[in-house]
Amino acid sequence: MIDTLKLKGRIVEKNKTIQKLAFKVGCTPYTLGQKIANEAPMDIEEAMIICQELDIKDEEFANFFLQRKLQNTTL
């Protein structure tokens, strides 16, 4: 799962917009918004383009794109 808040924060930090990223990825802003919100699947090629545009390093990839959702978990 994508860490939506972290990714949106990076978009703002790098002075990008969903519209600009969507153009680079090759989809509509609406579709990219769905993907970032985990409402539609994002493929690895799209994630790599976003990483390139937002200067997300290889070692940071998992922090943005591989978050697990933990619900109803008791320790």
Describe these PLM feature segments:
Residues 9-10, 14-15, 60-75:
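Short, charged recognition helix plus adjacent turn
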Residues 45-60:
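DNA major-groove recognition helix of helix-turn-helix/homeodomain DNA-binding modules
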Residues 18, 29, 47:
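Helix-turn-helix DNA-binding elements, focusing on the entry/boundary residues of the two helices
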Residues 4-24:
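Short basic helix-loop element that most often maps to the first helix and adjoining turn
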Residues 36, 46, 65:
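DNA major-groove recognition helix of helix-turn-helix
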Residues 14, 32-35, 56, 72:
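A structural preference for long, well-packed, hydrophobic secondary-structure segments
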Residues 15, 41-44:
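Residue at a beta-strand N-cap/secondary-structure junction
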Residues 27-42:
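Recognition helix of helix-turn-helix/homeodomain-like DNA-binding domains
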